[in-house]
Amino acid sequence: MRVKGIRKNYQHLWRWGTMLLGILMICSAAEQLWVTVYYGVPVWKEAATTLFCASDAKAYDTEVHNVWATHACVPTDPNPQEVVLENVTEKFNMWKNNMVEQMHEDIISLWDQSLKPCVKLTPLCVTLNCIDWGNDTSPNATNTTSSGGEKMEKGEMKNCSFNITTSIRDKVQKEHALFYKHDVVPINNSTKDNIKNDNSTRYRLISCNTSVITQACPKISFEPIPIHYCAPAGFAIIKCNDKKFNGTGPCTNVSTVQCTHGIKPVVSTQLLLNGSLAEEEVVIRSENFTDNAKTIIVQLKEPVVINCTRPSKTTRRRIHIGPGRAFYTTKQIAGDLRQAHCNINRARWNATLKQIVGKLRKQFVNKTIVFNRSSGGDPEIVMHSFNCGGEFFYCNSTQLFNSTWLSNSTWNDTEGSNNTGGNDTITLPCRIKQIINMWQEVGKAMYAPPIEGQIRCSSNITGLLLTRDGGDNQNETETFRPGGGNMRDNWRSELYKYKVVKIELLGVAPTKAKRRVVQREKRAVGIGAVFLGFLGAAGSTMGASMTLTVQARLLLSGIVQQQNNLLRAIEGQQHLLQLTVWGIKQLQARILAVERYLKDQQLLGIWGCSGKLICTTAVPWNASWSNKSLEEIWDNMTWMEWEREIDNYTSLIYTLIEESQNQQEKNEQELLGLDKWASLWNWFTITNWLWYIRIFIMIVGGLVGLRIVFTVLSIVNRVRQGYSPLSFQTRLPAPRGPDRPEGIEEEGGDRDRDRSGQLVDGLLAIIWVDLRSLCLFSYHRLRDLLLIVTRIVELLGRRGWEALKYWWNLLQYWSQELKNSAVSLFNAIAIAVAEGTDRVLKILQRAFRAILHIPTRIRQGLERALL
């Protein structure tokens, strides 16, 4: 009875255990997540890539060659697309922007390339015999008018004669040319006082001892033309639209564009010309306001117009300085001989300074703001230098930066209008230089040929470059001076709100969908989603931003469009048989875009996801990558946030997907070996029938061989027993009728089982009998073997079950014995402890009583002693 109860309880426990295991398997299968690949997700990362240019084809004169080579740029998009990214915050840093470095290198390359075919003026590095060319020698001199500008000083121009090689190398002739006095330096041994008095006559060009002077080509133009920097396919430009953005930190109003706005590459110092304006108020930007070595870039809200002019009319002539080379110099200066100058409205300038001071006071609280002139250095830094109509002006900006602003917002102009033509206009005296130290690098100089006629240009001052004096912080005055010279700050003032990002079209995320492995059926791709635009859903949650096809299509279409633009640009310059900087950048951008596209497609192909936007995999999602639930991921996170979370595990996930796909391909290859069994119709093909015939012949041959072997063995066995083999000609007894049972007269009924078979006639009959006997033999042997195995398994199962029951009963018995022993031991210990405790308590009780009886014993002793 006890054994039966144990068996029933065991079966009950087995049933419940099976149910619990099934429930656990179902729950584990329901919660299992799998990696899913998405192509076209709105995710980007900061990158430094090759940008190409776009320019308006009608923005320049086709007759002249502008130094910016914008004819090699692609045409601007008449309808540029700008997609606002909702709920997106992006970090910018204008001081560490690769776009600035790239533009700087591009402008340097353009200048170098434009001057490369031009004439080197090395033959002019000879001794010049010069005399002053003053305005008193010209009969056409006029007086200074009220429009501003001082009369040209005597000695401002030098009339120099020199010996030069003609078109015939061994022939030298004497020529003369006019140079500005700041373009030549004396080379005699006169003292400094003589040089100061300017009474020397022997000169040389200023840069002959340090630089190679290159004359700008005659038809070259330095007029700035807006250049749009564009990102290649697979990349994008992120733009910050915050109106008070200081250039660093997070920006909440973000959009994506393919090209920047038109940036005019104006090469100037101190003042930023013809740039972009602030929208709401003046903005000052600096990498660190507390570091006086850092330049402060000021962006104005409203422009200040500066009108510059060279009043005199100039003509030029050409001097041959060798075979195929010519030097252009000033032939005659006529008309108004006033000095070149620039005019600025005083009230407008003072109002601008007041706005700038208000912004500076937020950084330098309770300080007196002082604007002072440049502290010294190269002429390009000390003066406001820029290009006006092809001539390089160097203007004294002291009158612009010569004021003190007290903490109560009052100001004091230290010079006032003493040096101006009136109270309403600030006139800056300018001088013109023809030999320019190249701002790109040391050791190069350029000679700008004189421009004929009068020169007038009007520009907008849109920003300033300031530096702050260092010193004791206890000083209550902060002095700011005009700066510049590093053209990166000029480009940075326009590119501060842009950054280049690389679009990461591939994304992985967990889903409940698992790839059906070893499935060769092709399914069409369909997505019921609304396409919001390129990266337009970057701020939406992962479940709501199903804009995958937009990025995928625009990437390929962008490559094709860029290729067409490149071919059009190359076609326009094919007569030159060379590419400009922009053409090379076009090629680089094209190759880069194709490489990125092919790389993504290669990964998709390796993962078995070619042509799919959503691709499930057989890779289980590891909770160590991210333990968030599906609801937290798909309903609350954007793709950008999700990408940042799993960025450290992306390469590992990619590797696992590749390994899983490789394993699946191996499984498919093995399955193809069994694929011919998938259709029964293939069994009836002629190829299979030939195999069937071959197999049949082999089987028949094997049976015949076995028959022969068995026959020989039977004969040998019977011979050994004393029998002789019967002749094959022995006839069988005639079969009897149904009314006569076989056997002898004494015997009746059916035939007993004979030990030997019948002898038959004919090949087919023999084959049939042999085949039948072989099949029966095989069947009997297999049946016996199966019965033996079944008996053994049954016996082992019964013995095993009995052994298990025995061990279970034995375990229960010894468990009960151990339990009883433990209880007995516990009881014995408890009894022993109780007895010991009683003895201790009795001893303590007796001792206590003895102590209590001590006074009584003392009293009794005293009583006995007294008696």
Curated annotation (Swiss-Prot):
GO terms for biological process, alphabetical: clathrin-dependent endocytosis of virus by host cell; fusion of virus membrane with host endosome membrane; fusion of virus membrane with host plasma membrane; positive regulation of plasma membrane raft polarization; positive regulation of receptor clustering; viral protein processing; virion attachment to host cell
Region named V4: 395-430
Region (CD4-binding loop): 374-384
Motif (YXXL motif): 723-726
SUPFAM superfamilies xref list: gp120 core (SSF56502), Virus ectodomain (SSF58069)
Family (UniProt): Belongs to the HIV-1 env protein family.
Residue ranges the record marks as coiled coil: 644-678
Topological domain ranges for the Extracellular compartment: 32-695
Misc. comment: Inhibitors targeting HIV-1 viral envelope proteins are used as antiretroviral drugs. Attachment of virions to the cell surface via non-specific interactions and CD4 binding can be blocked by inhibitors that include cyanovirin-N, cyclotriazadisulfonamide analogs, PRO 2000, TNX 355 and PRO 542. In addition, BMS 806 can block CD4-induced conformational changes. Env interactions with the coreceptor molecules can be targeted by CCR5 antagonists including SCH-D, maraviroc (UK 427857) and aplaviroc (GW 873140), and the CXCR4 antagonist AMD 070. HIV-1 lineages are divided in three main groups, M (for Major), O (for Outlier), and N (for New, or Non-M, Non-O). The vast majority of strains found worldwide belong to the group M. Group O seems to be endemic to and largely confined to Cameroon and neighboring countries in West Central Africa, where these viruses represent a small minority of HIV-1 strains. The group N is represented by a limited number of isolates from Cameroonian persons. The group M is further subdivided in 9 clades or subtypes (A to D, F to H, J and K).
Region (V1): 130-159
Pfam families: GP120, GP41
Organism this protein belongs to: Human immunodeficiency virus type 1 group M subtype B (isolate JH32)
PTM comment: Highly glycosylated by host. The high number of glycan on the protein is reffered to as 'glycan shield' because it contributes to hide protein sequence from adaptive immune system.
Annotated stretches, region: V2: 160-208
UniProt lineage: Viruses, Riboviria, Pararnavirae, Artverviricota, Revtraviricetes
InterPro entries noted in UniProt: Gp120_core_sf, Gp160, GP41-like, HIV1_Gp120
Entry comment, domain topic: Some of the most genetically diverse regions of the viral genome are present in Env. They are called variable regions 1 through 5 (V1 through V5). Coreceptor usage of gp120 is determined mainly by the primary structure of the third variable region (V3) in the outer domain of gp120. The sequence of V3 determines which coreceptor, CCR5 and/or CXCR4 (corresponding to R5/macrophage, X4/T cell and R5X4/T cell and macrophage tropism), is used to trigger the fusion potential of the Env complex, and hence which cells the virus can infect. Binding to CCR5 involves a region adjacent in addition to V3. The membrane proximal external region (MPER) present in gp41 is a tryptophan-rich region recognized by the antibodies 2F5, Z13, and 4E10. MPER seems to play a role in fusion.
Protein's recorded name: Envelope glycoprotein gp160
Transmembrane segments: 696-716
